[in-house]
């Protein structure tokens, strides 16, 4: 049975929040839900992301901190009780991923300006990417321009190491091991484990 519902209808949700991209203002299907503590986050296919109060079901705020921000992914970081948003921007032709970490208590108080940009030294233009590994408390980024993979600590976002090898095609992280999958060479194994 239905336990509750959340609504981002314009009458309730968009008043006082300016989003210049018209598609952010239209209803679209929910592609991701993250819930922790007293907050529920709903990310729409359009890129609009709303935070709701679990207690009241009411809209707390939209997480789109900039008017042209399209949020593509959410990650709850239990290491520091924050929500990481991965976004693209119209002003950049939606080309570069930008990450921001905002403490949940700041979101509850509608203080989105307390969010901190992450991985600002990285150029995460497509086909670059960022992946979050909750089990190992690691973040993997790929800077496609420089062909560099970097691993960061999820606790404090410091860089742990980087891998510069044009033959790496994929990286898998498991507890205590990192698997590098390389382009196959003649008479050489196609993978290394670190």
Language-model features: where?
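Canonical WD40 repeat/beta-propeller blade segments in eukaryotic WD-repeat proteins
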Residues: 19-33, 68-76, 118-132, 166-176, ...
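WD40 beta-propeller blade core
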Residues: 50, 61, 93-98, 149-150, ...
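Hydrophobic/aromatic beta-strand positions that recur at structurally equivalent sites within the blades
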Residues: 52-54, 76, 95-102, 132, ...
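WD40 beta-propeller repeat blades
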Residues: 142-194
């Amino acid at each position: 049975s239905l336990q509750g519902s959340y609504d981002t209808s314009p009458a309730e949700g968009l008043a006082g929040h300016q989003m210049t991209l018209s598609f952010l203002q239209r209803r679209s299907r929910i592609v991701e839900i993250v819930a922790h503590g007293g907050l529920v986050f709903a990310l729409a296919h359009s890129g609009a992301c709303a935070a709701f109060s679990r207690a009241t079901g009411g809209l707390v705020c939209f997480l789109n901190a900039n008017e042209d921000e399209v949020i593509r992914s959410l990650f709850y970081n239990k290491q520091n009780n924050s929500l990481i948003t991965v976004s693209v921007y119209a002003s950049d032709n939606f080309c570069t991923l930008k990450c921001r970490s905002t403490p949940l208590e700041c979101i509850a108080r509608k203080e989105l300006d307390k969010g901190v940009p992450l991985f600002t030294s990285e150029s995460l233009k497509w086909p670059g990417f960022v992946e979050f590994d909750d089990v190992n408390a690691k973040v993997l980024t790929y800077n496609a321009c420089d062909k560099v993979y970097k691993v960061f600590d999820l606790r404090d976002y410091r860089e742990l190491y980087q891998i510069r090898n044009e033959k790496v095609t994929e990286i898998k992280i498991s507890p205590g091991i990192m698997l590098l999958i390389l382009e196959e060479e003649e008479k050489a194994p196609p993978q290394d484990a670190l």
